[in-house]
């Protein structure tokens, strides 16, 4: 049954959904990587599609920017449409010197300055982590594809334009691989509602050096990330 934010019916979504922030990227993934893809959501322009990848039913849908937006969509997908696994595929900024542009980062865990997980966890710290099997499958998929993916912690920020530059020093000290805006929220939603989740990001800019990828470079590396996500789903079928 349709929700306020998703005009689909039960069965329209696969049990696994890839989620970029940008709905147009969801459309690109569906058109480029899925066979027989059909649109299953268009409320507020947040496009969603379902098709098959090498015979495996998979869905893809945008989640917007920030934890509040992605939390709405992931919650409804899990509780109203029977989705079991969420894979966020997006971009992140690097702070560590050895993390370079176009690197692929697999988010084993996600720190955050948001209070959403404290709200749901009775004001205690919640360890926002990805599902272990999904992490392992993504690592194995990356190796099979010849992509040298990094695995570690992300930082999910509430502010894109942060006024606290010193926080990047703290992130570097604690070995944060990438800064983005959603992973911790998605991991919290998955834990609350009994689903599994993973975030895979491509480094699109370096916060320290101010380097940025070009549109063409982003697209090429983005494709590597999507292939890792899709192949990891196939590996999950063998569990």
Curated annotation (Swiss-Prot):
This is Purine nucleoside phosphorylase DeoD-type. The gene is deoD. Catalyzes the reversible phosphorolytic breakdown of the N-glycosidic bond in the beta-(deoxy)ribonucleoside molecules, with the formation of the corresponding free purine bases and pentose-1-phosphate. A purine D-ribonucleoside binds at residues 5, 180-182, 204-205. NCBIfam families: deoD, PRK05819.1, PRK13374.1. The keyword RNA-binding does not apply. Its EC number is 2.4.2.1. Gene3D superfamilies: Nucleoside phosphorylase domain. Belongs to the PNP/UDP phosphorylase family. Homohexamer; trimer of homodimers. One of its GO terms (molecular function) is purine-nucleoside phosphorylase activity. Phosphate binds at residues 21, 25, 44, 88-91. It comes from the Bacteria. InterPro entries: DeoD-type, Nucleoside_phosphorylase_CS, Nucleoside_phosphorylase_d, Nucleoside_phosphorylase_sf. Transmembrane segments: none annotated. It is an enzyme of class 2 (transferase). Keywords: Acetylation, Glycosyltransferase, Transferase. The active site is at 205 (proton donor). GO terms for biological process: purine nucleoside catabolic process. It catalyses: a purine D-ribonucleoside + phosphate = a purine nucleobase + alpha-D-ribose 1-phosphate; a purine 2'-deoxy-D-ribonucleoside + phosphate = a purine nucleobase + 2-deoxy-alpha-D-ribose 1-phosphate.
């Amino acid at each position: 049954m349709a929700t306020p934010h998703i005009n689909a019916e039960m069965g329209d979504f696969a049990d696994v959904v890839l989620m970029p922030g940008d709905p147009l990227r969801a459309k690109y993934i569906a058109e480029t990587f899925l066979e027989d893809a059909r649109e299953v959501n268009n409320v507020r322009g947040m496009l969603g599609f379902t098709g098959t990848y090498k015979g495996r039913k998979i869905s893809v849908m945008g989640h917007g920017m920030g934890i509040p937006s992605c939390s709405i969509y992931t919650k409804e997908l899990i509780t109203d449409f029977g989705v079991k696994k969420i894979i966020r595929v997006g971009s992140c900024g690097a702070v560590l010197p050895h993390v370079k542009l176009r690197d692929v980062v697999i988010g084993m865990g996600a720190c955050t300055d948001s209070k959403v997980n404290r709200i749901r966890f009775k004001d205690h710290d919640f360890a926002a982590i990805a599902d272990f099997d999904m992490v392992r499958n993504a690592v194995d998929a990356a190796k099979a594809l010849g992509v040298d993916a990094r695995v570690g912690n992300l930082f999910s920020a509430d502010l894109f334009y942060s006024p606290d530059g010193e926080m990047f020093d703290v992130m570097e000290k604690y070995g944060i691989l990438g800064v983005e805006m959603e992973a911790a929220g998605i991991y919290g939603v998955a834990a609350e509602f009994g689903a599994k989740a993973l975030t895979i990001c491509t480094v699109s800019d370096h916060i320290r050096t101010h380097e940025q990828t070009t549109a063409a470079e982003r697209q090429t590396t983005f494709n590597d990330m999507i292939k890792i996500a899709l192949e990891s789903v196939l590996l999950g079928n063998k569990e």
